A protein has these predicted regions:
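N-proximal low-complexity "stem/linker" segments adjacent to membrane-targeting elements
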Residues: 1-23, 350
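Acidic helix N-cap motif at the loop->helix transition within catalytic regions
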Residues: 15-18, 40-49
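A conserved acidic beta->alpha catalytic loop
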Residues: 23, 35-45, 58, 82
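Conserved donor nucleotide-binding strand/loop of the catalytic core
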Residues: 44-68, 72
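Catalytic-site signature of metal-activated, phosphate-bearing donor transferases
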Residues: 64-70, 81, 88-208, 212-217
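Short aromatic/hydrophobic "clamp" motif used to bind/position activated sugar donors
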Residues: 78
Length: 350
């Protein structure tokens, strides 16, 4: 049977830490808690489960803290939860079974990650696979009978275990601060972080957040030869221009995208702009484009229930205006269709 080290980094997690550890502690052969500066009862709560509690000076880098926690592990595999995660009874049983039968050649186990919708800042599906269990020591093996080479790719097992991510607040402001400091220090972001920064801005960013990010995304949009990065830049700029009520700037960006390969987010921002200009007829066309004619690249809601809610608002506004009998019948029918679509819409499963 494999042995597990739980390695967790924490800061001021007194409200959720016990809930997390209660759900997995009995499956762990050691529990390692790395505290990055708690001022509440986090460390006292952790002490009920382990004496392996270490302090780590926060340097604005989650990876550095996690690497430090991994250095303390001694078991076969490392399980790396966040304090606001929970394994329910059924998935606790699945992890217990996995521990009994886990083959030693498996180097990473992925688990399905499900976040409470209210505080979902990065997921565009009900669940997504994330690596959560890691073999502590990896051995290298040669492959191919001739022109042999060392296998570099890890052996990954996609399990059916579902981790419930249950945060009690948004962490966007913290994330934005780290993105900004990384850009200030290094000047660039990786492909992954470029997408994640744009995604969080589109999902939860307010005007202040977008204004701080504006110059970096403006430069990215103007200079990149990566079509995905250009698309991310267009989305962020469009939202920023719309929140600033800068119609000229919004149209300058959006019309370039609409002329080529528009995404749902740009259509959604155009729709919100026209709705703010008290033009529900024009807004409804762009909400419809966002929902049925384009695909979302950063925020699934812009091409899903968000666009449908916008359509509903447009039709309700129009029905409050003076209309011909034919127009009233048409918009009433469209409103009913939008309401039905809203009731049927669900996040993609994965």
């Amino acid at each position: 049977m494999a042995t597990f080290s739980l390695c967790m980094i924490v800061k001021n997690e007194e409200r959720v830490l016990a809930r997390c550890l209660d759900s997995v502690a009995d499956l762990m052969d050691e529990i390692i808690i790395v505290d990055t500066g708690s001022t509440d009862a986090t460390k006292e709560i952790a002490a009920r489960y382990t004496d392996k509690i270490y302090d780590f000076t926060w340097v604005g880098d989650f990876a550095a803290a996690r690497n430090y926690s991994f250095e303390k592990a001694t078991m076969d595999y490392i399980y790396a939860p966040d304090a606001d995660e929970v394994l329910d009874e059924a998935n606790h049983e699945e992890l217990a079974k996995l521990k009994q039968v886990l083959l030693p050649e498996v180097e990473i186990v992925q688990m399905k990650y499900a976040t409470v919708t209210e505080y979902n800042t990065v997921l565009n599906a009900a669940t997504e696979y994330r690596p959560k269990l890691f073999k502590r020591q990896r051995s290298f093996t040669w492959v191919d009978p001739i022109h042999e080479t060392v296998r570099l790719e890890p052996v990954v097992f996609d399990s059916d275990i579902v981790i419930h991510h249950m945060p009690e607040q948004l962490h966007s402001k913290r994330d934005f601060s780290i993105f900004e400091k990384t850009i200030e220090k290094e000047g660039v972001l990786s492909d992954k972080l470029t997408k994640m920064y744009a995604m969080e801005l589109m999902k939860t960013g307010d005007l202040e957040d977008l204004q701080r990010a504006f110059l970096w995304f403006e430069q990215l949009y103007a200079t990149t030869d990566n079509p995905q990065h250009r698309e991310y830049g267009a989305c962020v700029l469009a939202k920023c221009y719309r929140l600033q009520q800068d119609g000229y700037g919004l149209l300058k960006v959006a019309l370039k995208e609409v002329a080529t390969n528009p995404c749902s987010e740009v259509c959604y921002e155009l729709a919100q702009y026209y709705l703010g200009q008290h033009d529900p007829r024009e807004a409804s066309l762009w909400f419809l484009n966002a929902f049925s004619e384009t695909e979302a690249v950063l925020d699934v809601h812009a091409g899903g229930d968000g666009a449908l809610q916008g359509l509903k608002r447009c039709y309700e506004t129009l029905l409050g205006q003076e209309l011909t009998q034919e127009e009233r019948a048409y918009f009433q029918e469209q409103l009913q269709e939008a309401e039905e679509a809203i009731s049927l819409w669900e996040m993609p499963a994965e």
